[in-house]
Amino acid sequence: MLPTTDRVSRHNGDVDDHTPAPIISDLGDDVYSIDTQMAGHAGITASYLIRGSRPCLVETGTALSAPTVVSALAALGVSANDLATVVVTHIHLDHAGGVGDIATAFPQAQVVVHERGARHLANPT
């Protein structure tokens, strides 16, 4: 387990040099907070990983935060084929802007969103 506020270093070479090292907090019971470091700032928004036999990511953060979230998931041992579900609570860009990038990085994951938001995720225009 990771102690709260531990900073986890970059997991692999797949993340470019501009991606900040993920900040991961162990919330207990296999739940982790991942600071998305929105716009390069810590403490604004977070994603949550619920580990288990079918890991679930709640919220993706912005598209610019997606590499940080992917790096954090890798540091937590979640590979491209491990993530089962991505849940977005609503489709504001700070919560769901990274869905496309996360879905690409984790092609096996099912994206779950309210039916009213689904069409906007597919076509935000």
Name every feature range the model reports, one short phrase each.
Residues H18-L76:
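Conserved beta-strand hairpin/beta-sheet module of binuclear metal-dependent hydrolase folds
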